Amino acid sequence: MVVKIRLARHGVRNRPFYHIVVANAWKAPQAKPIETIGTFDPIPKKIDSQDSIPRIKDIQLNVERFKYWISVGAQPSDTVRSLAEKFQLLPKKPVS
């Protein structure tokens, strides 16, 4: 069984919200996952109403479960890989 770590879209129109899930690679993106290991909110939120620049995106991830699934051979999608690289959970992909 090929297992992937990918994003499953939830939320409403113009307001996406993603669950970071471990799922069979051959199933539909909205099919029931094996496990949900985190969430990702791509729309930045203002920290303070007076500050115009500081914004933050909400990412919650169970790092222990992420590392476990990577260790047993789960392949992260490109988006999940880039998120994991930002937090140094995976080494940067070599540029060829």
Curated annotation (Swiss-Prot):
<keyword id="KW-0687">Ribonucleoprotein</keyword>
<dbReference type="GO" id="GO:0032543">
    <property type="term" value="P:mitochondrial translation"/>
</dbReference>
<keyword id="KW-0496">Mitochondrion</keyword>
<comment type="subunit">
    <text>Component of the mitochondrial small ribosomal subunit (mt-SSU). Mature yeast 74S mitochondrial ribosomes consist of a small (37S) and a large (54S) subunit. The 37S small subunit contains a 15S ribosomal RNA (15S mt-rRNA) and at least 32 different proteins. The 54S large subunit contains a 21S rRNA (21S mt-rRNA) and at least 45 different proteins.</text>
</comment>
<dbReference type="GO" id="GO:0003735">
    <property type="term" value="F:structural constituent of ribosome"/>
</dbReference>
<dbReference type="InterPro" id="IPR023803">
    <property type="entry name" value="Ribosomal_bS16_dom_sf"/>
</dbReference>
<comment type="function">
    <text>Component of the mitochondrial ribosome (mitoribosome), a dedicated translation machinery responsible for the synthesis of mitochondrial genome-encoded proteins, including at least some of the essential transmembrane subunits of the mitochondrial respiratory chain. The mitoribosomes are attached to the mitochondrial inner membrane and translation products are cotranslationally integrated into the membrane.</text>
</comment>
<keyword id="KW-0689">Ribosomal protein</keyword>
<protein>
    <recommendedName>
        <fullName>Small ribosomal subunit protein bS16m</fullName>
    </recommendedName>
</protein>
<dbReference type="InterPro" id="IPR000307">
    <property type="entry name" value="Ribosomal_bS16"/>
</dbReference>
<dbReference type="GO" id="GO:0005763">
    <property type="term" value="C:mitochondrial small ribosomal subunit"/>
</dbReference>
<comment type="similarity">
    <text>Belongs to the bacterial ribosomal protein bS16 family.</text>
</comment>
<dbReference type="Pfam" id="PF00886">
    <property type="entry name" value="Ribosomal_S16"/>
</dbReference>
